[in-house]
Amino acid sequence: MKPHHTVLKVVSMVDAGCKYVIIGHSERRAMGETDADVNAKVLAALDAGLTPIMCCGETLEQRESGITTEWITMQIKLGLAGVPEDKIRKVIIAYEPIWAIGTGRTASPEQAEEVCESIRAAVRKLYSSKNARAISILYGGSMNDKNAFELLAQPDIDGGLIGGASLVPEKFVKIIEAANQPNE
């Protein structure tokens, strides 16, 4: 995407009253969106006063090859390039395991936590421990009313990026209720 197109779309979003924007979703990446495109959009969103929700994730092949952490760390580093330290806390990062999107499969709570912990570690390395603790990390791989509580109980999962489950009000309400349960 050309830089001026990004700026025009961001201005239109702000004019429409948007506050958040999902960037780097697996569907966009499948259509050819690159890490450089994601970075340009993150920077444009921040400049416009929007809160970017930057997605990152791995394919099943990458997971099975044992390169998940390296892949995610690279996406974080490239996606956040040039984001000043005083704006990093405004960025929300969503872990979106591509192999789980729309397949009915989901990462186990332990798998999701492992990746979200590596996301926080990447932010710590790029910025600081204080900023790493302050950012929000979402899980977005087929979270539903049945698995939300266990996923949201993980220490490095701060919320969910809900897809299909948000279209069924009864299921979405159960996810919201799970998010409001105290973690012990």
Sequence positions of predicted segments:
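Active-site loop-to-helix "anion-binding N-cap" substructures in soluble metabolic enzymes
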Residues: M1-E184
